[in-house]
């Protein structure tokens, strides 16, 4: 089973010749035979190149660590936390 949680694109201009615009998806995954239990699947790939990206299978603790890192970066740039 793979259940999509959210998807989107980064906010970098598509016309920048030095940096590719990226797409991301976050999903819940339970069919990773090598993984022990449920995983949060994070996929990052260049816009227009579906299937050619990088996929991370994050255990709950690792997903929480990533969430905390994103929250810390937002705080450092002066953004209020949601919720």
Identify the meaning behind each predicted range.
Residues 1-83:
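Positively charged, low-complexity terminal tracts
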């Amino acid at each position: 089973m793979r259940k999509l949680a959210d998807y989107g694109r980064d906010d970098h201009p598509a016309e920048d010749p030095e940096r590719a615009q990226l797409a991301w998806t976050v999903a819940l995954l339970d069919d990773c035979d090598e993984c022990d239990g449920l995983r949060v699947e994070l996929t990052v790939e260049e816009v227009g190149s579906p299937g050619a990206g990088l996929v991370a299978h994050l255990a709950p603790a690792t997903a929480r660590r990533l969430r905390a890192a994103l929250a810390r970066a937002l705080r450092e740039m002066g953004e209020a936390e949601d919720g």
